[in-house]
């Protein structure tokens, strides 16, 4: 039985989304146990009679405070020690939960998770990784915003972590790793990227060299590594592009009676296209490099999206991702010391 602690008060919608998503997750996975962390009186009102259906597979753990989306990470860490976010992560630290899922403030989540859980040996900084849609299925990208400025060593560590995550959760023996750059040629890029490429060439990962921004969506590689500034810009740009495309398609097909009829004929194709680029099915970013599993849901996630983040958490628990990353880092650094 896998136990996941949910920050029930975090995000733009709080328990209005988290509670229904939790119930959906329990329905779909009979081997799942969930802990809703937050204001007990509020949560019980949302649950009412539904909690009885799941017995001890669903329980409420009271937390008196909430980390707001505008809270500064340092203040949330220092001043809100009984927040739903902090308590959910504490449950992971104490062994009462196998993972935590939160739609709350990203900066606060990273700060609290790093403080409470600590990083794995050999990891300087945790990184945020998520899957984005591509022509071949999806591509994992990291870092997506945790680290704005990165050294070559950080990029190297990100690549090793991402490689091991994809090997574990997707059961690919040798996923390909690309380093995001302004061109594929070795002479291009800043010094950090060039040095990171040198490190990765001997890192015992399937490093294929530099890739460009369009390779993320072409699916040229399984994992794209970059710093958090570029990664976050790329992610937000892709989300905006998907919305723009959907907007224009909807507008063009509703511009006249003829285009409306054409839209009805094309509806199955349009629905398939919409599903393919729907960001909700990719919701759930992992905070890699910690001694525990923490999944960040989009702050504006709906119930389907949040349930997907729970599914990602379950998979990482089943595959023991932190343990595997820890073992990989130990092997990598042992090999580097011998070289």
Swiss-Prot record:
Coiled coil: none
GO biological process entries: fatty acid biosynthetic process; phospholipid biosynthetic process
Enzyme class per UniProt: transferase
Record-linked InterPro entries: FA_synthesis, Phospholipid_synth_PlsX-like
Any one GO CC term of the record: cytoplasm
UniProt subcellular location: Cytoplasm
This enzyme's EC code(s): 2.3.1.274
Reactions performed catalytically: a fatty acyl-[ACP] + phosphate = an acyl phosphate + holo-[ACP]
Similarity comment: family membership: Belongs to the PlsX family.
Subunit-level organization: Homodimer. Probably interacts with PlsY.
Biological role stated in the UniProt entry: Catalyzes the reversible formation of acyl-phosphate (acyl-PO(4)) from acyl-[acyl-carrier-protein] (acyl-ACP). This enzyme utilizes acyl-ACP as fatty acyl donor, but not acyl-CoA.
Name of protein: Phosphate acyltransferase
Originating species: Methylococcus capsulatus (strain ATCC 33009 / NCIMB 11132 / Bath)
Lineage summary: Bacteria, Pseudomonadati, Pseudomonadota, Gammaproteobacteria, Methylococcales
């Amino acid at each position: 039985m896998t136990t996941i602690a949910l920050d029930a008060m975090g995000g733009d919608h709080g328990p209005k989304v988290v509670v229904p998503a939790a119930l959906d997750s329990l329905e779909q996975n009979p081997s799942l146990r969930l802990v809703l962390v937050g204001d007990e009186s509020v949560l019980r009102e949302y649950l009412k009679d539904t909690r009885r259906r799941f017995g001890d597979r669903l329980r409420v753990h009271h937390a008196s405070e909430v980390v707001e989306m505008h809270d500064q990470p340092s203040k949330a860490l220092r001043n809100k020690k009984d927040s739903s976010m902090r308590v959910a992560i504490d449950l992971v630290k104490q062994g009462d939960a196998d993972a935590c899922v939160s739609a709350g403030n990203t900066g606060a989540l990273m700060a609290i998770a790093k403080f409470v859980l600590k990083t794995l040996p050999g990891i300087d900084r945790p990184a945020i990784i998520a899957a984005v849609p591509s022509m071949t299925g999806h591509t994992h990208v990291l870092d997506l915003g945790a680290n704005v400025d990165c050294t070559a060593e950080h990029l190297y560590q990100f690549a090793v972590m991402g490689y091991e995550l994809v090997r574990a959760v997707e059961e690919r023996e040798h996923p390909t790793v690309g380093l995001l750059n302004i061109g594929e040629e070795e002479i291009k890029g800043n010094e950090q990227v060039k040095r990171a490429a040198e490190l990765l060439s001997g890192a015992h990962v399937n490093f294929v060299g530099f890739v460009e921004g369009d390779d993320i969506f072409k699916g040229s590689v399984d994992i794209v590594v970059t710093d958090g500034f570029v990664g976050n810009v790329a992610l937000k740009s892709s989300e905006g592009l998907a919305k723009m495309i959907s907007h224009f398609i909807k507008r063009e097909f509703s511009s006249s009676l003829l285009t409306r009829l054409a839209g009805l004929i094309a509806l199955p194709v349009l629905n398939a296209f919409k599903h393919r680029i729907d960001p909700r099915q990719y919701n759930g970013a992992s905070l890699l490099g910690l001694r525990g599993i923490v999944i960040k849901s989009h702050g504006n996630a709906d119930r389907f999206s949040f349930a997907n983040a729970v599914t990602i958490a379950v998979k990482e628990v089943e595959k023991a991702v932190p343990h595997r990353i820890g073992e990989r880092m130990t092997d990598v650094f042992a090999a580097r010391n011998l070289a």
